[in-house]
Amino acid sequence: MMGKAIANMDAATVKGSSSLLYLTAEQTVRGVESACIRCGKCAEACPMGLEPFLLQKYARNEMMDELEENAVQDCIECGCCLYSCPANIPLLDIIRIAKGDVIRIIRTRK
């Protein structure tokens, strides 16, 4: 689930395409976001062993040190957390932005 969204079926697949995920129109509609219930489903789904529920909390509160300490930069942006969240929190979107911000901060230190 690490690819890019394609809006129509006319897009070509290339040698580097590792898989295709087709969703129905119903499956592409995100539910209404609610508060995180800390169920841990996103952490269980994360192949990198991260805790997306914490990362999104830190990101929303602009807690850059905590994001770096919790290795937001190690997120592979697979989207497993997004699909597993019963609260419909856009975890991947939030974490992707935070990851970019933390990587920029790390680069400025060098």
Which residues does each PLM region occupy?
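Redox cofactor-anchoring modules in respiratory/redox and cofactor-processing assemblies
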Residues: 1-87, 92-100, 104-110
